[in-house]
Amino acid sequence: MSFRRALSLACGFAGGSAVLVCAAVVADKNGYFGEGRRVTETLAAVNAAHPPAWPTANGWDYNWDKREPSSMVNGKRKESTGENGSQDAENNKPRATRHIFLIRHSQYNLKGDGDKERFLTPLGREQAEFTGQRLASFGLKYDTLIHSSMTRATETANIISKYLPGVELVSCDLLREGAPIEPVPPVTHWKPEAVQYHEDGARIEAAFRRYIHRADAKQKEDSYEIIVCHANVIRYFVCRALQFPPEGWLRLGLNNGSITWLTVRPSGRVSLRALGDSGFMPPDKLTRT
C-alpha cells in the first residue's frame, strides 16, 4: 500500500484530525520516515487524536434495578423441579415502558426559618402554573403525581395538579431534599457534615430504588408518572439511572419548575429525554434558587 493511499484511508477514519494528518504529510515530504514507518506513524497519530473511552469495568449493568427477568427466578424451585427457569424468566419479563417526569419545585422563600416558612413566592406559584400547563399540553394519561412532603414541593404539586384532573396525589418523605453523596469535585460554598451524607444518602438511595426501575411484569401498558421533588434528588437520580458516576450530580444545574424526563425500557435500558427543560417559561420567569 502506498503512503498516499494509506494517508487517504487514515483521513477517512480521522474525521476532525486534519492537523495531525497534515503533520504526517510534511514529515513524508521531508523524507523523515521510511515507507512502512510512515504508515504506522500516521495511523498512530490519528488514533491519538480521538478522546479516550470512559473507563468502565463491566459496561452497562442490565440488572441495575435487580429486576432483570432471569435474576428473579427462584433458585430453590429451579433445583427441586429440575427446570431451566426459562419459563419463570419469561413470566417475569416486563413488556411496558415507564416514563418518569422529575419536576423541580418552584422558587420559594429562602428567608424562612424552617420548612413551613419556606413556601412558594408569588413568582414560584406562577412558575408552577407554567409547569402544569406544559405537562398538560403533552396530552398524556398520567398515572400518579408523587411529591416530596416538604412545603415547597407540596405546593408546587398542588398547583400542577389543577391542570391534571383525576391524577392521584401522593406525598413521600423519602423524596425530601438532602445531601445524597459527597460531590466530586468538592465546592467551597456547600459543605454538609459527614453525618448528613450518611443519613440523607441512604434515604435518597431508597427513594431511587422505590421509584426508578423497569416496569413490573404485570404492567400491560406504558405508564407516565410525575415526581415533584428537589434539585439534589433529581440530579442524583439522573446520574444513578444513567449509570454515570453519582458523585458528579452537583455538576448539573436545574431551574425551578423544570422538567426532567427519564424513560425506562422493559430491557432495563434508560434514556434521558429531557434534562431541566424550562424553555416553556418566559425568560424573565426563570430562576435557580
From Swiss-Prot:
Protein family membership: Belongs to the phosphoglycerate mutase family. BPG-dependent PGAM subfamily.
Catalytic activity: O-phospho-L-seryl-[protein] + H2O = L-seryl-[protein] + phosphate; O-phospho-L-threonyl-[protein] + H2O = L-threonyl-[protein] + phosphate
Source organism superkingdom: Eukaryota
PTM note: Phosphorylated by the RIPK1/RIPK3 complex under necrotic conditions. This phosphorylation increases PGAM5 phosphatase activity.
Region span, Disordered: 68-96
Record carries keyword Endoplasmic reticulum: no
Record field: transmembrane: 5-27
GO BP annotations listed: positive regulation of mitochondrial fission; programmed cell death
Localisation per UniProt entry: Mitochondrion outer membrane
Enzyme Commission designation: 3.1.3.16
Protein's UniProt name: Serine/threonine-protein phosphatase PGAM5, mitochondrial
Note on domains (UniProt): The N-terminal 35 amino acids, including the potential transmembrane alpha-helix, function as a non-cleaved mitochondrial targeting sequence that targets the protein to the cytosolic side of the outer mitochondrial membrane.
Membrane topology: Single-pass membrane protein
UniProt keyword terms in alphabetical order: Hydrolase, Membrane, Mitochondrion, Mitochondrion outer membrane, Necrosis, Transmembrane, Transmembrane helix
Classification via InterPro entries: His_Pase_superF_clade-1, His_PPase_superfam, Mito_Ser/Thr_phosphatase
UniProt-listed SUPFAM superfamilies: Phosphoglycerate mutase-like
UniProt function note: Displays phosphatase activity for serine/threonine residues. Has apparently no phosphoglycerate mutase activity. May be regulator of mitochondrial dynamics. May be a central mediator for programmed necrosis.
Cellular component annotations (GO), alphabetically ordered: mitochondrial outer membrane; mitochondrion
Pfam family for this entry, one: His_Phos_1
